[in-house]
Amino acid sequence: MENTEQEHNLPEGDETQWPNGVKRKRKNSQCSMNSTSDKSISVPGYVPSYLEKDEPCVVCGDKATGYHYRCITCEGCKGFFRRTIQKNLHPSYSCKYDSCCIIDKITRNQCQLCRFRKCISVGMAMDLVLDDSKRVAKRRLIEENREKRKKEEIVKTLHNRPEPTVSEWELIRMVTEAHRHTNAQGPHWKQKRKFLPEDIGQSPAPTSDNDKVDLEAFSEFTKIITPAITRVVDFAKKLPMFSELPCEDQIILLKGCCMEIMSLRAAVRYDPESETLTLSGEMAVSREQLKNGGLGVVSDAIFDLGKSLSQFNLDDSEVALLQAVLLMSSDRSGLTCVEKIEKCQEMYLLAFEHYINHRKHNISHFWPKLLMKVTNLRMIGACHASRFLHMKVECPTELFPPLFLEVFEDQEGSTGVAAQEDGSCLR
């Protein structure tokens, strides 16, 4: 009897063979020849190298994108299977055609039950689908592993960076010794420093404007300026290659770098506990005292530099090499041996960079950050040059030590102090 005949197996396509032999389109079918809304659209994307070209999905035959839940499938079937398991939807699936639908990339959206059964029959594993908590944990683990790999790459890069050569180690040794022999009090500066009395230079006189110089504080600073300048000169004379330069170039370089090196030496002796800098290894001063004693805004720049450098944990060699780089600045106006000075600075910079590699600081991008301090020090030197003119107006000439004037006054056309008999320049 017709009403008892069983439904035949479905033929290819989305047509259904009914018992009476009449072929009918499924209700709500979106696969008619005139419809383009459900045509498979292949979106180009990443395809793993282990897949053959245009390898098909084992569920629907669409282009596969990789192994998903233990089978080679497309993104659509992967997502369908995952959603079904995560939301426990399969008990509610049903088939109108006796569970014998053919699943391909055209019909896959028409019967959820047959599609799910096809997923299971080809070997997709339900136990590999993660619930929300496991999925979050997996993503967290992936991120942690990614960060771990990044850190390993950084460590690997650090280990592969070149360290000083034998000749560079010798250069570093000589520069370090030059610094240690000319750096007042050395590592014992904290024990030997004396604090400038609090009543000196703390605030401008009430009747004066904010840019007046506190003469008492200025007078205290001038007592230590001459030995501080002399130590910078002595440091330069001990450096390889500096004494080979013409006397005129030596003077230009010393005048240009003197304030920069003195500022660096003060900045590395910043004490965060007392919020003071120690000048010339002996006089501890506050920001306001240094500012009101003549330096003005330059004081802020030096203190800010000190705060920043306190995080760098520089050793004597790094401070010494910074000073050498500042000294051998080939862009100082009036130099004659520009190329020679530039090559000298390059030698110091290369040895410096290799020494930084050897030290392996924990600060990221340590080398470029440290080079930025050279720029900061150059700006301090430039600001002090204009500030010096203000001090000359505000302070009596007799308060200025001769060497202070000689180094910081503009003496175009003059070489300053005459050369000594041994050919060295400045005192």
UniProtKB/Swiss-Prot annotation:
Lineage: Eukaryota, Metazoa, Chordata, Craniata, Vertebrata
Feature: compositional bias, Polar residues: 29-40
InterPro entries: NHR-like_dom_sf, Nucl_hrmn_rcpt_lig-bd, Nuclear_hormone_rcpt_NR1, Nuclear_hrmn_rcpt, ThyrH_rcpt, Znf_hrmn_rcpt, Znf_NHR/GATA
Keyword entries, A-Z: Activator, Developmental protein, DNA-binding, Metal-binding, Nucleus, Receptor, Repressor, Transcription, Transcription regulation, Zinc, Zinc-finger
Disulphide linkage map: none
Cross-referenced SMART domains: HOLI, ZnF_C4
Listed name of the protein: Thyroid hormone receptor alpha-A
Tissue specificity as recorded in UniProt: After the mid-blastula transition (MBT), expressed throughout the deep cells, which give rise to the embryo proper. In adults, isoform 2 shows highest expression in the eye and liver. Expressed in adult gonads.
Region of interest (Disordered), residue spans: 1-40
Gene Ontology MF terms in the entry: nuclear receptor activity; RNA polymerase II cis-regulatory region sequence-specific DNA binding; zinc ion binding
Location within or outside the cell: Nucleus
